[in-house]
């Protein structure tokens, strides 16, 4: 997987080199180091908008990574790519896998809720209120969890939960 050398951002380039150097001298085994380097390359590719290359690097990282928190972070980034590409079902499934590895990722829950809420709005526009309610209830369920994990971090979501009457009182405490 050759990484293109088209980075324009000096700070990103410097940080990447610095991180690679630090990883090489860290007292961790070579498998963990390699997993992290693949992750960093995937992140750089994702930031450059090269999603297919990013996914390849993330897949390689997952093959080597044993740490559940790190696996969850990698899966979350993959789900973000799927979501950006409009592959919502794959994004949801990957967010669920990420949460299975590390359940304390409120951004996964937030993004799943965005997909559910969007589907609810589409059903509403099409005049299907029952389907709309199902999607909105799913959005409320994951968003309530996100707000509990990150209080005050998603004020727009807290507002949606309040205004739609779908939030529990304990969410705001």
UniProtKB/Swiss-Prot annotation:
TPR repeats lie at residues 35-68, 72-105, 120-153. It is found in: Cellular thylakoid membrane. Pfam families: TPR_12 (PF13424). InterPro entries: PSI_Ycf3_assembly, TPR-like_helical_dom_sf, TPR_rpt, Ycf3/AcsC/BcsC/TPR_MFPF. Gene3D superfamilies: Tetratricopeptide repeat domain. GO terms for cellular component: plasma membrane-derived thylakoid membrane. GO terms for biological process: photosynthesis. Keywords: Membrane, Photosynthesis, Repeat, Thylakoid, TPR repeat. Signal peptide: none annotated. It comes from the Bacteria. It is a peripheral membrane protein. SMART domains: TPR. SUPFAM superfamilies: TPR-like (SSF48452). Transmembrane segments: none annotated. PROSITE patterns: TPR, TPR_REGION. Essential for the assembly of the photosystem I (PSI) complex. May act as a chaperone-like factor to guide the assembly of the PSI subunits. NCBIfam families: PRK02603.1. Belongs to the Ycf3 family. This is Photosystem I assembly protein Ycf3. It comes from Prochlorococcus marinus (strain NATL2A). The lineage of its organism: Bacteria, Bacillati, Cyanobacteriota, Cyanophyceae, Synechococcales.
